[in-house]
Amino acid sequence: MGSMTKIALSIAGSEASGGAGAQTDIRTFAQLGVFGATSLTCIVSFDPHHDWSHRFVPIDPQVIHDQIEAAVAVHGHIDAVKIGMLGTPATIGVVAEALEQYRFEQVVLDPVLICKGQEPGAALDTDNALRSRVLPHATMVTPNLFETRVLSGMDEITTVEQLEEGARRIHDQGVPYVLAKAGTLFDTGTALDVFYDGSTMEVLEVPAIGHERVSGAGCTLAAAVTAEIARGASPLDAA
């Protein structure tokens, strides 16, 4: 590996089909010329017999810690970290401790707030832990429409103006950069996201490609943002 090669660390789950999670992160990093390291947090396999619900197996927190420790020790410097699915308060706790220990300069949080098939009570505990323990360490957060609504405390987000307000509210919680993703859900014929950094509110809009919702699209975008930041791009340019 050349001395100029940038390193990105994905702290995320393994998704067996390869369409999301750490597999997608590593593939996206490589496509953009960034070397990817991983710390797997859980193993997810879709259940084709029960409406594709998530069969979710968490990885022992000590093993997660050991993976992060190894990645940092081997590479010496991590240019950017992308955090995906964590899944349990225990996992969130060990990842938060690692963020406090290593003080990574660039942390992109793709806040997976719900796992299909997860019990509502467990999901709420996980969401609250993510908000209190990991969100304060993020330099950039990339919530989808549902996650933007939850993190901002808004009842609904159905317009660009409401999405902008959601981004403002998340920024006000201490996150320097927010990329709130509506994608194609506003039925504008475009993929539409909003970027906010406390002063600049930018609506990012391009023609939509296809009409079906695709698993892993959010992972791919967040991983691409992470890779571009690792390469030295500004958060807005990366978005």
Task: Enumerate the predicted regions with their spans.
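Short, small-residue alpha-helix embedded
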Residues: 149-150, 212-235, 239
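N-terminal beta1-alpha1 ligand-phosphate binding loop
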Residues: 10-23, 223
